[in-house]
Amino acid sequence: MADSAQAQKLVYLVTGGCGFLGEHVVRMLLQREPRLGELRVFDQHLGPWLEELKTGPVRVTAIQGDVTQAHEVAAAVAGAHVVIHTAGLVDVFGRASPKTIHEVNVQGTRNVIEACVQTGTRFLVYTSSMEVVGPNTKGHPFYRGNEDTPYEAVHRHPYPCSKALAEWLVLEANGRKVRGGLPLVTCALRPTGIYGEGHQIMRDFYRQGLRLGGWLFRAIPASVEHGRVYVGNVAWMHVLAARELEQRATLMGGQVYFCYDGSPYRSYEDFNMEFLGPCGLRLVGARPLLPYWLLVFLAALNALLQWLLRPLVLYAPLLNPYTLAVANTTFTVSTDKAQRHFGYEPLFSWEDSRTRTILWVQAATGSAQ
């Protein structure tokens, strides 16, 4: 921030601060943002772990609220210097309706932007997603791409559609005059597949393996690579972006950045086994054990069952047409834009990230070997 802000302690607001990424952003701010005076944590469901944070030198204010309620968002934003908007509904399994996904991800983001404009908060960092870009509905690979790589971003699934629209709203808002007449400065960060402590989907895969007797069966060719990024490094990138957004407003304002680190490019299944293997699971098959057409059929069948059962019961299997398409499409990024624009370097090495994640899976599932 500018010199005028250096003398004062700053007020940060993290929306979705009790979510998977949000909790890591909150803890990272407390550890590594020396100018922090007050940290507001806004979420619909407040975690009990927040209480332990209230004994430190920084004032931690827990605010229970809903991003779809404009008045609640405006009250939380008022007086904040910086907003890190991580709140969002990540649902690729059909647990929520398309309407709910849109309300949270799009209307919620619109509410945050309007709250910044109305209250005079000038700096907004938005958590976007790689799925704003792809994989697209045509299954086109994105191989070692960067923020400027041409790619036909065509989506039908409610989640990537909602994130794409929300990101557009954030970038379009850059430069809008806020209360007091100064411009709003925004940027968006696009994590690839996030892993690490608190990753619910990793836990779901572990439980699925247990139900199958400790085995997981290869469904996707090992040659289909995915870029993954450790949650601690994603949180660190958010902290750095928020810190530098004022001094580098001309450079960073209205920009998007892929989140990246030293995690290796591997297939989704092979990457997961880096953590699930030490927890006792085994991946069967050097090649997929089922033909792809059969997976397509099973995914379509799951989608049909989900539609038929929706009035009666929630049926949200891991395999559906969208998750199959994503898992079966190469999507890797290779960029240094965040380093060039605001000095980002990964805080955690691959070895450290891997160890931390393994220990979490073992502790969370009681599977320590």
From Swiss-Prot:
Q: What is its EC number?
A: 1.1.1.-, 1.1.1.181
Matching SUPFAM superfamilies: NAD(P)-binding Rossmann-fold domains
What residue ranges are annotated as transmembrane?
A: 289-309, 311-331
Among the GO molecular function terms of this UniProt record, one is: oxidoreductase activity, acting on the CH-OH group of donors, NAD or NADP as acceptor
Pathway recorded for this protein: Lipid metabolism; steroid biosynthesis
Gene Ontology CC, one term = endoplasmic reticulum membrane
- Which InterPro entries does UniProt cross-reference here? 3Beta_OHSteriod_DH/Estase (IPR002225), NAD(P)-bd_dom_sf (IPR036291), NAD(P)_dehydrat-like (IPR050425)
What coarse category fits the chief subcellular location reported for this protein? endoplasmic reticulum
Q: How does it sit in the membrane?
A: Multi-pass membrane protein
Q: Name one Pfam family in it.
A: 3Beta_HSD
Catalytic positions are 159
Q: What is this protein called?
A: 3 beta-hydroxysteroid dehydrogenase type 7
Q: Which organism is it from?
A: Homo sapiens
User: Encoded by which gene?
Assistant: HSD3B7
